[in-house]
Amino acid sequence: MDNILRRGSLEMTAAMLISGTIGWFVLVSGQPVLDVVFWRCVFGAATLLLICGLFGFLRPGLLSRTTFLLAVLSGVAIVGNWVLLFASYSRASIAIGTAVYNVQPFMLVGLAALFLGEKISVQKLSWLGLAFLGMLAIVSAHGEQGVGGDQYLLGIALALGAALLYAFAALIIKRLTGTPPHLIALIQVCTGVLLLAPWANWSALPQTSTAWASLLTLGIVHTGVMYVLLYGAIQKLPTALTGALSFIYPIAAILVDWLAFGHRLGLLQWIGVAAILLAAAGMQQGWGSATRKTVTS
């Protein structure tokens, strides 16, 4: 059991560290956002097709028509999420875009309450309030940015839109229980290829090896390999540990943004980032619920 937990922890850590470098590869590629997402889907689809074939997930009859359509719908949301998140990096910075993106658990809670009738506890509302205060701190710091204030605010709005689309995708995927997650991911990126092919800039393909290397890495490593590591870890780890290790992602992204691009967060931004990540961790780990049960019992 210890070996399983150790392996799962290593897989989850590796997956989150890989995720933390996505923004760097997006910006280094030097390509328009739609082209970056398109090529990520192309190379990711090729990688996941190979992985699904090796795992035996391509056999006929594995998917019903409803399951397939839901997976396609989740793919539309995931691809839109990538477009908005990647667009936020050049406007609000990788660190801020990633931090704001981490409000997604709260959006998922809100959507579940709206569409599934799930109740929102006082504890979750408290964490939501803290995350909102963090957002206010980040937004109020727009004057400190070297870029125009409007671009900074647009970057935050794009990251929020990305988080909302991810929450929609997660809500749809909840209905795909029992479907191999690698196959869901394959359908999602194939959906992205079909959606973005008409918008891809075929007349101005990347001209440098750096651009192609970045796009290949985003497709093969950040999509194919990362999904295998992530889903492997989720199968081995308890939910609480999975949630805790997931915060390696934003921390890694903040460090990459600082080391690679010299983007240093101001005091208000640090306060906002810390508040959002603390609130997300508190809600995912259920902090406060145990105390409340003790008091009421």
What label would you give each PLM region?
Residues 31-80, 107-108, 165-169, 185-203, ...:
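Transmembrane alpha-helices of multi-pass small-molecule transport proteins
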Residues 9-10, 97-103, 172-191, 223-259:
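Helix-helix packing/entry segments at the starts of transmembrane helices
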Residues 1-38, 73-76, 84, 146-175, ...:
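Glycine-/small-residue-enriched transmembrane alpha-helix faces in small-molecule transporters
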Residues 55-95, 101, 137, 219-237:
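Specific transmembrane alpha-helical segments of multi-pass solute transporters/efflux pumps
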Residues 48, 52, 72, 111, ...:
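Hydrophobic transmembrane alpha-helices of multi-pass small-molecule transport proteins
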Residues 4-8, 30-38, 62-68, 140-165, ...:
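Juxtamembrane helix-entry segments on the extracytoplasmic side of multipass membrane proteins
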